[in-house]
């Protein structure tokens, strides 16, 4: 049994299972909890609760477990559409993924799509579990499937030759039938996950960035901007940049307040007010960010991967075409952008996920993996992620 208390002493890593429908993602998730956490049966995981992220409803199951080295938060989704939505909205951030492939079927369409999505949304590392090996009698056939999986991973720019592939049977692990492909395989899988999936950098160790939510003018003191520090640390007296919407400018933080108390610094997760030197109330606005100088730049053109809501999800009722002009909601503000669809894609239907080029009418502080909502008059009609910056 895992300890019930959440021990902060271990490194925390977020992972998830991905792969084709019925290849055994949920069974594997259940099997991992059996040996490394508080056992959750298949039915408990499969009945995933609905949650909302960026105005989109997604069913996601969360389980947690721990190895000797790490504490894991693990996400498993019941349906393919939930995976697409989850990965694009970042509802459950993934530091790495376990790709489940049935040895009996080999890679299938959703295997490919999940690998592509993992690449587009920047999942840093993948470990493979080749499931249902007891259904394949021929060792050569098993080798062939492994080769296919490696080639597919390489095709989408993952290091296919180096990725650990563990062969086993989630069912054998759950039923205690064959230890070598059951329990032993699940334990080996987790030791490979420990070894191969890198420890994420903690937000507080990254470069300072704070999206501006509000701007106030305090007589005799100057201009205060408020927001939640997304990452890094800002200390009183430090020089920072104001990026996005207008030309980038520099200023000094002369004070940091939280809950009406003065602090000497604000850090990732804190809701702060920052007093800025020599900036007037009109010179700064919501939608800009405060950032460590040189760490983030403003851009207007980018490639994105997006999911478009269905009518039932509250989205559009009709398709859209190239030159579609919705608002793109980045962090704290809406910016109008013009969509260009890829060659060969004539239109996008509600419920589709699509790669597209976007050109914003004003620049936004942007980097790859930044997420956004697509809105029409304040109503969310889609969600996306920046896959590549063009200019």
Curated annotation (Swiss-Prot):
Catalytic activity: GTP + H2O = GDP + phosphate + H(+)
First-level EC class: hydrolase
G2: region residues: 55-59
CDD domains: EF_Tu, EFTU_II, EFTU_III
EC number(s) recorded for this UniProt protein: 3.6.5.3
InterPro entries reported in the protein's UniProt record: EF-Tu_GTP-bd (IPR041709), EF-Tu_GTPase (IPR050055), EFTu-like_2 (IPR004161), EFTU_2 (IPR033720), G_TR_CS (IPR031157), P-loop_NTPase (IPR027417), Small_GTP-bd (IPR005225), T_Tr_GTP-bd_dom (IPR000795)
Region listing for G3, in residue ranges: 76-79
Cellular component terms per the entry's GO annotation: cytosol
Region (G1): 19-26
The family this protein is said to belong to: Belongs to the TRAFAC class translation factor GTPase superfamily. Classic translation factor GTPase family. EF-Tu/EF-1A subfamily.
Oligomer and partners: Monomer.
Name of the protein: Elongation factor Tu 1
Organism: Bartonella bacilliformis (strain ATCC 35685 / KC583 / Herrer 020/F12,63)
Underlying gene: tuf1
